[in-house]
Amino acid sequence: MYYPEPISKLIDSFMKLPGIGPKTAVRLAFFVLNMKEDVVLDFAKALVNAKRNLTYCSSCGHITDKDPCYICEDDKRDRSIICVVQDPKDVIAMEKMKEYNGLYHVLHGAISPMEGIGPEDIKIAELLRRLQDETVQEVILATNPNIEGEATAMYISRLLKPTGVKITRIAHGLPVGGDLEYADEVTLSKALEGRREL
């Protein structure tokens, strides 16, 4: 189907987003065309502002507008515990329950041979460096309860065993195959309470 070039480019841009197929991209493009210009400009500014002003914390890998992030900078946090998660959205999910007071380490992915993602493609080396520098007594593996998350947790567990650090895994109150970011606070809280040593 023929669209004027500006609409085609907008549709193509929307299709670059995860979960957006051709039909949804067309629907979004026409929705944007019907929005007031000031709303569209605010939306565009928000996109540019986020891209320009957000970075990843050099310590934990969480998304932040200043380095180090507010969590790593907080002196009241328990620095003897690091919770390892796959994605910055998982940090936000954990923080919502307001029960965990340690630090985080964001892997930015999980081991997935089917997708060509190996241990060297995620932030495992950075985690090992942190364990050398900090007085960490426990590492909580809070990767997603799916095949990739489990494989990643087991890989990290084997790497960390010789260090003598206590290694725990969050309990499976979370649905297998689900993502941490979609879990409610009560489920996350129970999963954290029921973590087990590996």
UniProtKB/Swiss-Prot annotation:
Zinc finger residue extent: C4-type: 57-72
Record key words, sorted: DNA damage, DNA recombination, DNA repair, Metal-binding, Zinc, Zinc-finger
Cited InterPro entries: DNA_Rcmb_RecR (IPR000093), Rcmb_RecR (IPR023627), Rcmb_RecR_Znf (IPR015967), TOPRIM_dom (IPR006171), TOPRIM_RecR (IPR034137)
GO MF entries: DNA binding; zinc ion binding
NCBIfam families to which the protein is assigned, alphabetical: recR (TIGR00615)
Function statement: May play a role in DNA repair. It seems to be involved in an RecBC-independent recombinational process of DNA repair. It may act with RecF and RecO.
Official protein name in the record: Recombination protein RecR
Gene: recR
